Amino acid sequence: SGHRFFEAPGAAGVTTGNLTAKGIPNVVMADGPAGLRLHKISSVSITGKVKGVEPNISFMKYLPEPVKKVMLGNPNSKNLLYQFTTAFPVGISLASSWNLQLAEEVGNAVGKEMEAYGVTYWLAPGMNIHRNPLCGRNFEYFSEDPLLTGKFAAAITKGVQKNRGCYVTLKHYCCNNQEDNRNKTNANVNERALREIYLKGFEIAVKESHPGAVMSSYNKVNGKYVNNSYRLLTQVLRNEWGFDGFVMTDWFATGENTVIRHMRLHQATT
């Protein structure tokens, strides 16, 4: 996919471009879940600074006007940049089709847009289990069925990663099945339920499609934060399943000891 000197406006995160001259390109990440979440229209200032002219996160709509003027670009600028991305059906809708070929084709289409706009990692698909009907992000996830979940995540991954230099990020590993207090909640789950329900989808997707990245969840599992779990991140994910990509955290969840021991990339996104 070539060197990325430019961060796609609206991208969720980017690594340094200071090593490009040494042959190490920077990495650009874009959120999902329904295709790439990028700024559709951005303004480019005379100094080359690029800002989206519309909020791409809903809460920004409610910020005071002076704050928005600082954060957002000028829609009347003579130098505007356009990025048109496709709004694909969300996970629960795709899974309702029971059509794995369709899911792979959707992934391939997302990958083509990633390549066009210089995005390396798509922070999707989300594949947590539909355990609680009140979970505010169930629409992103595929199903209450771990087999269906794993198969659809694998199909989308295969589609995206057909495109050179484009990768998915399976999330949120694992047991992140509610949004309420998800930063602190403790999922108490026995080994059989953990293996057969909450890990099974991730296992299928990792083994069948070899994703480029996995995002760890905020919550604890049986009293230990997933970010600090050698068992879940190394023994299970890497040693048992053979995962060899990046493990990244959710927004600002990485502690000092986690960086030292388990994580290869600190990720500040959701």
Where are these regions (language model features)?
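Glycoside hydrolase catalytic-domain context in secreted enzymes
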Residues: S1-T270
